[in-house]
Amino acid sequence: MKVAVLGAAGGIGQALALLLKLQLPAGTDLALYDIAPVTPGVAVDVSHIPTAVNVKGFSGEDPTPALEGADVVLISAGVARKPGMDRSDLFNINAGIVRGLIEKVAITCPKACVGIITNPVNTTVAIAAEVLKKAGVYDKRKLFGVTTLDVLRSETFVAELKGLNVSRTSVPVIGGHSGVTILPLLSQVQYAKWNEDEIEPLAKRIQNAGTEVVNAKAGGGSATLSMAQAAARFARSLVKGLSGETVVECTYVEGDGKYARFFSQPVRLGKEGVEEILPIGPLSNFEQQALENMLPTLRADIELGEKFING
């Protein structure tokens, strides 16, 4: 099994490289790529950690050597948010970066499962899909927007608020990966009783948690460490699924189009990537209303990505 990280010298990428070196199954090959010349050094650095994960680093304009034979590709390349920016401000730079990398994936490892971390995820996943489609290699079971950080944040905040064991707290998060499109299904959390006045502030905190980090870092970056852990968790789940285990994660995928072309919801992962898209389950009145309210935003984000490739 080979996992490639594109954007491995960045804030998310370096932390992700460390976590994958520690957490991937023994015998996995880990390829780290970034345009930055420091990348082979990042690989040497993490290679000194005593785990049975084999690491190689690649830098320069062409990611092809890192992608050869990859089963899983994680893309975190791009610019990060700064105070005053929202995820859509990143679009102009990151859209082109994702397009270029996916063009290489389409040629070098078209059957790989691809996890998009680069924001704005609502849009960059649509870009990736259209590039793969133009190349004639698109398989919707193998393209994912990594929305796991919304799940991690929800689990953390719910457990804190309700005094629950965080390791046993599970919160499905549906929709997209920015602002109002992030919808934590708090009504489905086991052992949590909610007052009406708790739900909206908590949902808003989860939606705006990325901005909370950007502001707290005072211009020094965005959520890199928690995002790296979220991406590592998702990568581990993908690897387990590809190895034949049954794993369920919330992730942003192309499904039946009931709500939008791409939509984050619980997905059963398996040997082909997406094995089954699971139902979102019963919603509270608040959640139903929030879902209806977000859909125009989500659909517009997706359309932006499609138009970027197709004009």
Curated annotation (Swiss-Prot):
It comes from Haemophilus influenzae (strain 86-028NP). The keyword Protease does not apply. Keywords: NAD, Oxidoreductase, Tricarboxylic acid cycle. Homodimer. The keyword Oxidoreductase applies. Belongs to the LDH/MDH superfamily. MDH type 1 family. Pfam families: Ldh_1_C, Ldh_1_N. NAD(+) binds at residues 7-13, 34, 94, 117-119, 227. GO terms for molecular function: L-malate dehydrogenase (NAD+) activity. This is Malate dehydrogenase. Substrate binds at residues 81, 87, 119, 153. It catalyses: (S)-malate + NAD(+) = oxaloacetate + NADH + H(+). Catalyzes the reversible oxidation of malate to oxaloacetate. The active site is at residue 177. Its EC number is 1.1.1.37. GO terms for biological process: malate metabolic process; tricarboxylic acid cycle.
